[in-house]
Amino acid sequence: NRKDDLMRWARKYQLPFRVPKAFPIKTSRALRGAIAMRSWNQEQAFIDAIFAAYWEQGDGSIGDYARLRQIAATLGVNPDEFEIAAESGPVRAELIDSTNKALQRGVFGVPSIGIENDIYWGKDRMEFVEDHLARL
């Protein structure tokens, strides 16, 4: 099953991993939150915190604003301002635009890696990614 497969990959690469309490989850709020955090130059820190909460700590609540607001606060961002920004029209439009661009490019799942005109999908395709990068 999928959870067993995730555990195998984590063991192989000696990564901290806990099966999330909720899996899979709706990620649109977290994605909009990441876009919103650009306003505070905290986008990457926010993404890292979400990733750690979900995959390392098994926290299945990262799709909920209560949890996302806590993460924003730990990064020094006012939680109310964060949620307002994440729900704003421009942030929603940017996520829709980014999603449409990914679909037009041929992305159909996560993880997907685009190099030049090629799309590589799945964690088990990293050798192909390495081969492609070596040819550049």
What positions do the PLM features span?
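Structural alpha/beta surface segment adjacent to cysteine/selenocysteine redox centers
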Residues: 1-57
